[in-house]
Amino acid sequence: YPELFAAGAIMAGTPFRSASSLQEGFIAMFKGISKPAEEWAKLVHDQQPGYTGRYPALIIFHGDEDRTVKQSNMHEIVKQFTEIHATDQEADHTGIIKRHRYSAFHDAYGRTVVETWQIKGMGHKYAVDPGNESDQGGKTGTFASSAGLYSAYYSLISWKLIEQMR
């Protein structure tokens, strides 16, 4: 529903329509599936033929020690959604923030349409940063890891719902 959503966040996911069965889902997760950007984009376009509006911007978080969803899936999502946004796969901005690798991809108008966070030392979990500072939050648990980066906070910044506090 690209007409309903301006942006979204993916936590250790696979590209849209990377699988159409449970078995294919496991293959996509554990082994990864590589396709040309055009093929990935076609899977999105075929979902709503004739749609001419803007597609949602994405922010993607993936642990660099994830053994459940292969790291290459993040790159495949980048291929899919940079193609959807008619931009290239070369990051326009990269850096290390709070020890994690960050990349941003801009469209022809300079808007950030895809962002990636490779979370150092994290497996298949949600990145939290317990604490009381403005950029901290969340609790550690079975599916949440203290990564020194609160993914919900950075998602809200990406979606322009809040301004960066520090």
What are these regions (language model features)?
Residues 133-166:
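Catalytic active-site module of serine/aspartate enzymes centered on a nucleophile-bearing elbow/loop
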Residues 16-127:
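The feature captures the conserved acid-bearing segment of alpha/beta-hydrolase catalytic domains
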Residues 8, 64-68, 141-145:
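Second-shell loop/turn segments in exported
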Residues 1-4, 40, 73-77, 148-155:
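Stable alpha-helical elements in mature extracytoplasmic
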Residues 6, 56-58, 153:
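Residue-level detector of short, conserved catalytic/binding motifs and their immediate flanks
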Residues 2, 82, 86, 160:
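Hydrophobic/aromatic-lined pockets within catalytic cores
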Residues 3-19:
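A conserved short beta-strand
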